[in-house]
Design a protein with these regions (language model features):
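Canonical Radical SAM [4Fe-4S] cluster-binding loop centered on the CxxxCxxC motif
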Residues: 1-30
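Conserved AdoMet/S-adenosylmethionine-binding subsite of the radical SAM
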Residues: 37, 41-182
Length: 183
């Protein structure tokens, strides 16, 4: 849903299907939740020993809530499920995933609208996205990432965002990250 300049996964914006609407594009591999489970279950003992599991990330995993719910039904509670998300989904979708997802990593870009809109090329509200997360998920299950984005923000603006997120939303686990630009 976002169009971030430095997105490391440009493929998430490419079509899955060819123009006929049925044929899958080259390089795309469609998996059911069961097929994915069968691939990653090789790490079952490791996940159980470490308290680990699987992380669904970008593109935007909240675009596929049914897939995530089905995967949880297959793997059960023995694995942790984490979402790394930009939070661009409806309140209802996030709510439907509350009991399925153990941890949320929210990549918020910036709470300053001008920075957020310029970088993501969208008109979503980062404040509204954080507000819905606060209403739904206990803070101990949330990490908020605020990246330093070259040519878009500064260390100071990120520090400001982190302080405001803590103050306005009460999230304690807010971290500054540095984007590694892949060209």
């Amino acid at each position: 849903p976002l169009r971030c300049e430095y997105c490391p996964n440009k493929r998430c914006h490419e079509p899955i299907y060819k123009e006929d609407g049925e044929s899958i594009c080259r390089g795309v591999r469609m998996l059911s939740p069961k097929e994915l489970f069968d691939i990653v279950k090789i790490d079952d003992i490791y996940f159980q020993a470490t308290g680990g599991g699987i992380c669904f990330g970008g593109g935007e995993p909240t675009l596929y809530p049914e897939f995530i719910r089905e995967f949880r039904a297959i793997c059960g509670d023995r694995w942790k499920i984490t979402l790394e998300t930009c939070l661009v989904s409806s309140f209802a979708v996030k709510k439907s995933l509350c009991d399925v997802v153990d941890f949320w990593i929210a990549d918020i870009k910036s709470i300053q609208s001008t920075i957020f809109h310029r970088y993501t090329k969208t008109q979503y509200s980062p404040m509204q996205m954080l507000s819905s997360l606060k209403k739904l998920i206990p803070q101990e299950r949330v990490i908020v990432k605020v990246p330093i984005i070259p040519n878009y923000n500064t260390e100071e603006s990120v520090d400001y965002d982190i302080a405001k997120i803590k103050q306005l939303f009460g999230f304690e686990n807010v971290v500054k990250v540095r984007y590694q630009i892949i060209k």
